[in-house]
Amino acid sequence: MKIPSATILGTLLAAATAMAAVDPGLLNLVMPEAKILSGVQVAQSQASPFGQYLLSQMQINDEGFQKFVAATGFDPRHDLNEILAATNGDHRALVVGQGVFQVDRILAAAAAEGAAVTNYRGIDIVTSPDKPGSTGSIALLDASTAVMGDTDAVKAAIDRRIAGTSFSGSLADKAKEVSAVNDAWFATVTPLSDFLNGKVANPNLNGMTQGNLLQAVLQASGGVKFGSAGVTISGEAVTRSDKDAQSLVDVMKFLASLVQMNKDKDPLAAKAASLADAAKFTADGPVMHLTMSLPEQQIEQLFMPLAPKPRRTGVALR
């Protein structure tokens, strides 16, 4: 039986979309009280033109990097597939990754560098030797899954893995939705003012986070898609009302205009202005949308180092 080419194409596109979504196994490892999730489809991103550009900028000849790869057998350029990070908003974060890990080799390399290796429920936990009393740890749950965070967070993730718990709810649903159409993404269903309260060191900025506008943002999400011809950035903020969404659009447009007004002051401001110029803000009911498309050449230029300022020669005027 001959299958129509349109059916084959549709199936491939659907499969590609499904593959792009956050891995359920990684999602189930995050803490149940997580407030913000973010992730990167590393393998997909690296395959894009921009991903190849970033790889070309890596210092692969660095002695420390080569020593790390030789000792562990792990090369992040092609052994890392996906990263998922979660935080509960209380200075506790957990990072989980999917890739190819040579467990015994990595553990041996860590021990050789002085790291403490302890066993918890059949899984070895490696604790950093950098500082006395350090609580930064990493555990390899199997040859394809890694967990990193403070020791208690890593142990809790191991507990969830063994218990077979699942992460569900509105944040999980939003994460699946956003990650399915982006290579790098974030999602939160917590009001921004709640999450930022007391987290900003500057008292003036901390006060701004509690302003009426940010209090109106009930949840937010966004992402970056690396395409064959450039990069697309998108985001949305769900507010309390249609009026709040439009007010947020107006504020974002005003801030973008301020950035553009200062573009001639220094090269960094000029780079920011190019982003502001490409940004489009719209309101659809209580939701504010951001879209931004940048061609490959422009996005690469944004990541190029700034040229050093010319030095004064010290020649006196006559």
Question: Predicted regions: what is each one?
Answer:
Residues 1-6:
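Positively charged n-region of N-terminal signal peptides that target proteins for export
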Residues 7-16:
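Bacterial N-terminal signal peptides
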Residues 20-133, 174-213, 250-278, 300-318:
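Structural boundary/hinge residues at secondary-structure and domain interfaces
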Residues 36-38, 91-99, 144-149, 233-237, ...:
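Short cationic amphipathic helices and targeting signals
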Residues 90-92, 101, 120-123, 139-146, ...:
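Short, solvent-exposed coil/turn segments at beta-strand boundaries
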Residues 134-161, 227-230, 280-299:
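A short, solvent-exposed beta-edge/loop patch
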Residues 135-196:
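A conserved glycine-rich beta-strand in the N-terminal activation segment of trypsin-fold
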Residues 215-283:
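Intrinsically disordered, low-complexity segments enriched in Gly and acidic/Ser/Thr residues
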